[in-house]
Amino acid sequence: MEHPITVYITADTLISSLGANTRENIKAIREYRSGITRHEAGIISDTSILAATIQPEQWERAKNLGTYTRLEQLFILAIQDILSHSEMNLADEDCGLILSTTKGNIDLLANHPDTPDIRVHLWEMGRRISEYFQAGNRVEVISNACISGVSALIVAKRWIESGRYKKVIVAGGDILSHFITSGFLSFRSISSERCCPYDARRDGLNLGEACGAILLSSKGNDTDIILSGGAISNDANHISGPSRTGDGLYFAIRQAMEEAAVLAEDVSFMNTHGTATVYNDEMESKAIHLAGLETVPVHSLKSYFGHTLGASGVIESIICIHELKENVLFGTLGYEKPGVSMPILVQADHQEIPMKHCIKTASGFGGCNAAIVLTLPAYQKQPSRVQSSVTVHTTATVSIENSCLSMNGETVFSSSAPNFAQFIREAYKNTGGSNMKFYKMDDLCKLGYTAVEYLLKEKNFQPEEIGILLVNAAASLNTDIRHQMIINQEGDHAASPTVFVYTLPNVVAGEICIRHKIQGENTFFIEKEFDADKLEEYARIVMKKGNLKACITGWCNLLMEAVSYTHLR
């Protein structure tokens, strides 16, 4: 038995519509200023839209980074700021870098969707940023929809606890483009007014762009906030709609609190996803009640920053860190009248309250949920000794490549189909599956879905006993190209929600979770090449943390050709 490692947050910074660093952003929030403004038709949308964009003077700071994309410039500025305030060198072997984003450099796809710029690949974005800081191959990219930032913090915490790294910088970022705004407009989820989370008037979200960075370390002092717990779950309900019960988010909150040894009465406040869409906020209110946290103050920061996608979990955690340190709970800007069926404590005004612990949550497309616990060091629970690593073994493998599906090394299905689309339909039919929704999925989802049909045949687990960890190189680029071509040819108004929902790679995990009722951990990593050993190492950590009996792990990649490797453990 080993002594557990405490993970401290020792530095942070954020760039948003409200300012160039944490101090400026905190000042703006204290003054009840929102970064959400009206943008006329043109740069980010074909129509007038309310959004929170980074101001021109911010980009001036990056003028010497002209060979990097706009998003890469933000990442570099944020990481530089962290390094300038810490004794850390990303070239050191015990230092890691994790980037969280939903769409990365997707704005580059607009001009040449038929021949994508290599920088559109998330792994290439990661490589370029890593090269700038001489971080070598110690960079990871997580694209897990709107929980990406919180997921990245959890992954960083676990790598430090495992001894892989002593310090990790987690940086989350996304910028706005026609690609993103057209998709959300197609879902009719964007409000024509400034969003008002949890309010009876709420009718949608506002999008935003930002980049934030946090330094996590195995060493800290008595003023550094501790990342004391974290967990990820899935609704196993719907790929674009939140759970109607809130149970998936509740599972993540419960596990995060258990890891932190925190009870409901210990929690000072919650910072929730709070997008101001009707169904998200309703779901969160139910999860809060399931977790017994209905008497804990709740707030959302979306009416200040907008929904900043892959940056949101990082930048909102930064604000929570400073709320804990300064004994202030910021109000939910614009909140007036309760608008969710399960009563929760939301208010518009800032207030001073005694602080101990904060719970930060996030939810996203694909049914994913995440929760972390942030703790003042004086209230850190005395952790018990950690368990030794769990013993796992591979019980089955499935691979799909070159119109051939094999299981445990033996071919079980092959086809002379002229293309992947026809092959995968035939492979699915061969399982005896009858889910008509299969035929509406994009090809990446069909690939993963079919592989797991074979993998889990005659195997049964309870929803919280099994998780899924996937990796690929192309993310959702096949469907990204399709969405971009639609709006290029017909305009933003032609964007289809049934296409846009599949422009997130983790949705393949969401489809699998729905089919097999998987509500355990689910995370999607982006890598140029599959590192099976590293994924297995992380799967062991996940299984121990979540008390899982099984975890599907593998490579699920589709770009002109299909390659899928999945393993059940």
Language-model-derived ranges and their functions:
Residues M1-V139, N144, R158-E161, S177, ...:
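Conserved "HGTGT" condensation-loop signature of ketosynthase/thiolase-family condensing enzymes
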Residues G149:
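Short conserved active-site loop signatures built around small residues
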Residues A152-L153, L215:
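Active-site alpha-helical elements of protease catalytic centers
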Residues G173:
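Active-site loop/turn elements of alpha/beta-hydrolase fold enzymes
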Residues I180:
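Active-site-proximal loop->helix
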